[in-house]
């Protein structure tokens, strides 16, 4: 069972990075002035499909990572901690799936956002408590990095709101210098967060492989 969970944990990293890269590259074509609106809409559709991978990978990383941690340090967690966390993961995955296939239902999006806040706050509390109780430094650091990535994901969501407004204006009214500049600017802000997310994933991979000792 542990091997399967580890396999899921590794695949989650692969899909997170791979999907993020596809999202990053396709976003470039949305802001290319020389492309027509239809071509840019196609690029946006590709972006949305690529982005599903990282959105699914984040909760799976949480579930598999916690499962492994609780398996190797069982004395630090209550007996029902693993199924409880997997229930949260299943809820999170459901919200991601239905949000993707509902065309961005605002209620589902809000529920997903609040769940992320809950993961960030409660995860930080329990990770700190586990570290105080004797959790290995490298695992505690991995948890801290992951929770930072959750926070950065929330920041990306807020940064994308003005981009989305400019994109809708482009689709409904046609491309203008104003909408092009707005999309380019807000997408550049999001990319800064994405770069930091990638660095965090590289750091966590190094910690997990024990390439870095802390």
Model region roles, listed by residue range:
Residues 1-214:
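Polytopic transmembrane helical bundles with strong interfacial aromatic enrichment
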């Amino acid at each position: 069972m542990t091997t399967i969970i580890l396999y899921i944990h590794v695949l989650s990293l692969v899909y997170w990075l791979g999907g993020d890269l596809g999202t990053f590259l396709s976003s470039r074509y949305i802001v290319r002035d020389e492309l027509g609106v239809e071509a840019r809409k196609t690029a946006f559709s590709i972006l949305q499909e690529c982005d599903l991978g990282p959105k699914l990978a984040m909760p799976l990383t949480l579930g598999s990572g916690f499962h492994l941690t609780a398996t190797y340090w069982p004395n630090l967690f209550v007996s029902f901690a693993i199924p409880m966390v997997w229930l949260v993961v299943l809820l999170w995955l459901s919200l991601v799936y239905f949000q993707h296939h509902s065309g961005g239902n605002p209620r589902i999006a809000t529920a997903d956002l609040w769940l992320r806040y809950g993961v960030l706050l409660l995860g930080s509390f329990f990770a700190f408590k586990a570290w105080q109780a004797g959790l290995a430094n490298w695992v505690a650091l991995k948890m801290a990095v992951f929770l930072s990535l959750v926070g950065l994901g929330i920041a990306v969501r807020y940064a994308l709101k003005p981009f989305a407004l400019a994109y809708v204006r482009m689709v409904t009214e046609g491309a203008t210098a104003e909408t092009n500049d707005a999309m380019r600017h807000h997408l550049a802000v999001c990319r800064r967060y994405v770069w930091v997310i990638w660095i965090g994933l590289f750091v966590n991979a190094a910690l997990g492989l024990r390439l870095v000792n802390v």
